[in-house]
Swiss-Prot record:
Cited CDD domains: RecA-like_ClpX (cd19497)
Name of this chain's protein: ATP-dependent Clp protease ATP-binding subunit ClpX
SMART domains, A to Z: AAA, ClpB_D2-small, zf-C4_ClpX
Function: ATP-dependent specificity component of the Clp protease. It directs the protease to specific substrates. Can perform chaperone functions in the absence of ClpP.
Gene assigned in the entry: clpX
The organism of origin for this protein: Vibrio atlanticus (strain LGP32) (Vibrio splendidus (strain Mel32))
Pfam families named in the record: AAA_2, ClpB_D2-small, zf-C4_ClpX
One of the GO biological process terms: proteolysis involved in protein catabolic process
């Protein structure tokens, strides 16, 4: 290896055999049999190899693309119920990545469009969990955005381009990886137009955000500041093609059921011509959501252009008591399994009796928070036990029954030493 300050043994100046720079113009000059290469050319070669590897990696990933059935079976391991939504998502995601693998155009010249997804369902029904589980299974970058924090460019709040920057951060600013990612935009119903008719006043957090999202969701080349953008303003912006990114939008759409019901009722006549229904025949919110049409979403406040960018629409039903009990026990990362693992770290067994699980489910149903409320109920029930357990000795088992959930008694503590066996409170 030759330093730039030194000359060859013969006293003559040495030059890089590739770029022609002299040893004084570069930091290092590496000698080989009758040839030399400088450090700049070595860096350039490394960059070329890295780019080639990036081009090959997506092809390798796509070769093992799981089928819709395999995707749905994986979702079954983590998400209880919502069978129709899982099937729709599995097909949409499979078609999206199949399109990326084969390019936007088929051999016959048919252009394949992008199918972004809209999830409509009550809070705690599994919208976010479905999107997260999909991204984890497919091993692609995933980011979440809250639509309520977004505003038009130039106003206080998050710019829509920030969504792409978050996605880049998830994959260490690897543009090729980011372009195969999934973006989940939550609370999309909260950016609905404030009035049904377009207003002359500026709606920067409602219709304005929908307009800003149009191009991003459909597919555009977004310019995103590089890592540490403000610290290094001289760096060029990264160009990210969003036409390859799958966008999943989700929202509870509170009140949409009334819009659908009004349309359905109008279709069946009004006044003396109206169809009379008994109380039992009244449809649930979940049943009404399955009848959603684009016109209902327009009336709700989404602009037609934005709805057109989300061609795959699926609805999630409200979780009933049995589904909540299943969620507590059956998934791979079920809450009861998580808390049992925490107690296991203290060498203590945690047991939930059947009546306790049912009581937890009933409590969550009353709170109308869906599966999201289950963890807060368990935290409240187990707080004192988790506080005292690390300081206690000989506790081998903790038993939770219905009376504990209802606040009528404390958890039963079973000690390894039978002389100490007792309940915390009778």
């Amino acid at each position: 290896m030759t330093d730039k300050s030194k000359e060859g043994g013969s006293g003559k100046l040495l030059y890089c055999s590739f770029c022609g720079k002299s040893q004084h113009e570069v930091r290092k000059l590496i000698a080989g049999p009758s040839v030399y290469i400088c450090d700049e050319c070595v860096d350039l070669c490394n960059d070329i190899i890295r780019e080639e590897i990036k081009d090959v990696l997506p092809k390798k990933e796509s070769e093992s693309l799981p089928t819709p059935r395999e995707i749905r079976e994986h979702l079954d391991d983590y998400v209880i119920g919502q069978e129709y939504a899982k099937k729709v998502l599995a097909v949409a995601v499979y078609n999206h990545y199949k399109r990326l693998r084969n390019g936007d155009t088929t051999a016959e010249g048919v252009e394949l469009g992008k199918s972004n997804i809209l999830l409509i369902g009550p809070t705690g029904s599994g919208k976010t969990l479905l999107a997260e589980t999909l991204a984890r299974f497919l091993d692609v970058p995933f980011t979440m955005a809250d639509a309520t924090t977004l505003t038009e460019a130039g106003y206080v709040g998050e710019d829509v381009e920030n969504i792409i920057q978050k996605l880049l951060q998830k994959c260490d600013y690897d543009v090729a990886k980011a372009e195969r990612g999934i973006v989940y935009i939550d609370e999309i119903d909260k950016i609905s137009r404030k009035a049904e008719n377009p207003s002359i006043t500026r709606d920067v957090s409602g219709e304005g955000v929908q307009q800003a999202l149009l191009k991003l969701v459909e597919g555009t080349v977004a310019s995103v500041p590089p890592q540490g953008g403000r610290k290094h303003p001289q760096q060029e912006f990264l160009q990210v093609d969003t036409s390859k990114i799958l966008f999943i939008c989700g929202g509870a759409f509170a009140g949409l059921d009334k819009v659908i019901e009004q349309r359905v009722e109008t279709g069946s006549g009004i006044g003396f011509g109206a169809e009379v229904r008994s109380k039992d025949e009244t449809k649930t919110i979940g049943e009404l959501f399955t009848q959603v049409e684009p016109e209902d979403l327009v009336k709700y406040g989404l602009i037609p252009e934005f709805i057109g960018r989300l061609p795959v629409t699926t609805t999630l039903t409200e979780l009933d008591e049995e589904a909540l009990i299943q969620i507590l026990c059956e998934p791979k990362n079920a809450l009861t399994k998580q808390y049992a693992a925490l107690f296991e770290l203290e060498d203590t067994e945690l047991e939930f009796r059947e009546d306790a699980l049912r009581a937890i489910a009933k409590k969550a149903m009353n709170r109308k928070t869906g599966a999201r409320g289950l963890r807060s109920i368990l935290e409240g029930v187990l707080l004192e036990t988790m506080y005292e357990l690390p300081s206690s000795t000989d506790v081998s088992k903790v038993v939770i029954d219905e009376s504990v959930i209802n606040g009528e008694s404390e958890p039963l503590l079973i000690y390894s030493n039978s002389d100490n066996q007792a309940a915390v409170a009778e």
